[in-house]
Every structure is written in C-alpha cells, then in structure tokens.
Amino acid sequence: MDILSHIALVLVPGLGNASIRKLIGLYPDENLFALSKGDLETVFGRHKGIAECIANRSTFARAEQELTFCEKSHIRPLFFTDAAYPARLNRQETEDCPVLIYCLGDCDLNPERSVAVVGSRRATAQGRDNTCRMVRELAPWAPHIVSGLAYGIDSAAHTTALDHGLPTVAVLGHGLDRIYPTANRPLAKRILDNGGALVTEYTSGTAINPRYFPARNRIIAALSDATLVVEASEKSGSLITAAIAGSYQREVFALPGRVTDPYSKGTNRLIARNRALLVQDVRDIAFQMGWPIEEAPQTDAAKEAEHSLTEAEQQVIALLQEHERMTLDELTSHTGHTLAEMVSILFKIEMLGLVHTLPGHVYQVAHA
C-alpha cells in the first residue's frame, strides 16, 4: 500500500494500532482497500462497520487532505513498515504505539542512543538546574534527547540539548499545524533549525485536548532507551511516562529530592517503590546502560569531590588510574589498609561517583 492508503487505514474508526499491525502481518503484500467487501467481512467478522468503511474507501477524502497538508508543510508520514519509522516503536512490548506518525524535521529517529528527560511543568529553579546539568553531562555520549515541549522540565531539556549540540525530539499531543504551548513556538523553531524533530500521531486540525497528552507520553517512552524523571509531584504526568517506560522494559531513572519537597514526592515515590533507579549524576545512567564510562569527562560534581579527598582516598584513585581495574584484595594489599578501612574508602569514593563496582568486587575509576 502507498502512504495515502496507510493514512486512510489509520483513519478507519474502530481500527486500532495493534489490529493494524496484525492485519499487515496477515496481508503483507495486499492492499486492504482492494479486497472485496465479502473478504473484508470475513476478516473482521462481527465488526462489519470497519469492513464497510474500508470497502467504501470512506476515509480517503480525509486522507488526501492530510497528505496534501504534509506535502505542503514538509512533514514525513512514517508507517511502521517504513525504514525511517522508529525501530524502538516496533518492538513486541510496544505494539500499542502508533503505526503511523508524522515527523517534521530531518532528524534520524533511529539513533544509537536516546534518552527521555521529563518532569514537572511547574518546575522549581533547582529542577531546571538539575535538568540542565544532567543533559549537559550526557553530551559526551551524544544521545538524542526526547521530551514533550511542555513548560518546565521539558523546555529545559530541549533547550540544554540544543545548547550542547544534541539532537532533540519533541513529541506533541496534537497535530503539526499548531504548537502548544504557543509560548514555545520559538523553541520548536530552534529544534527544527538545529536538526531536531517534532513528532506526533495526530492529524492536522486535532484540537488541544488534555486526554491526548498521556497517550503522547507513550511515544516519548518508546522512542527512548531510558527515561529520566528529574522532578515530579505526586500527580505529575511524567509519572505516566515513567510507568509506560517500565512496561516497555526500558530503564527508568529518577533524581531524588527532599522528602518535604512537594515537587519531589513523585520522584521519591518512584525510587521507594523500585520503579526507578536513583541517580545523582549521568555516570549512574551510563553505568546502568553499559555506555563507555571511561570516554566521558568528569562531571562537575566529581571535579568538586576530588578536592575534598583524603590522602588515602587519593591513593586508591591513583592506583585505579594506573592499573585500570583492581580487586578489593589487590587494593588492600597495595595500600596496606585493613579490609574494613578499604571498604570504607571505596564506599565513599563510589558515592562521590569517582569509581564504579564491577562484578566480583572489582573496581574501576569512573573517568579516564
């Protein structure tokens, strides 16, 4: 089927994404709109309304309008069988994701690494600062930064990505004929001007509706290898994104906050209920994701931490830099410290993000 038929198929009332995936699997070489009404009724059984809609090509007029809009606006409609369609949306656990998305911008939606950064719309100054710090320190691994173009954490994530040369993808809960919130139009333009993309599953003319935004969140989660929740209250929509990411078997990370802070209750609860891994800096993310930690420069926090190290702690860091990896017994033998003293030293410098523990009580320095 051509792209016009794909758009028309998605517009058929009552025909969901999972059903379309199954249909295309059953008839990979068939144009469903070319099947007879009788054949379609056999396929859809008691859902005769769907069969009749396809047989009568009832959605083609609207599909033609949408395709014309896309062509005039340089928008790419991407069906799930297209090579440019995001492969992360095509996994078994993401079959509820849209089979057709609309993409404005030339950004490759199949990058090597991709991280969603989400959080409260009513972000605190600390929340915005933490977002900027985390995205800035992710730059050495060059992930795409995915978010939702909302106020607060989303805007900070997109802006910081742009400031540090990272492609960023904004997933919208409406059609590409508008930008919401309107105050973020300049940010949307900057995203497009710098190799990013605006993505949605909704056709042009789709009104702004709060119920579309939770559905939008599943695309944010699915486009990403990991989701980082920076700051979230108990009712933040970013918690929906985190829950969906977990259901998609993607990693979920959260920055902890003060227990008395209402804007950290959501993130703290994710951590407390084991629905997110606690992170303090990006090295925690890189280590969990299996990214090459030794290639990244020190984080700001790690640089500050090194100035406060004791002589014994500096000795351990120097040994690990010299030998690359050492066991607990080797470190104890080289330094002359007792086992208890060495465990205490390693615990502190690991908490500072300066070393990482590998299986078998093996330690390596967290930077080159």
Predicted regions and their residues:
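Short, small/acidic-rich helices and loops at N termini and domain boundaries
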Residues: M1-A84, L270, L352-L354, P359-H361, ...
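Glycine-biased, small-residue-rich flexible motifs in mid-sequence functional cores and linkers
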Residues: D2-I3, F80-A368
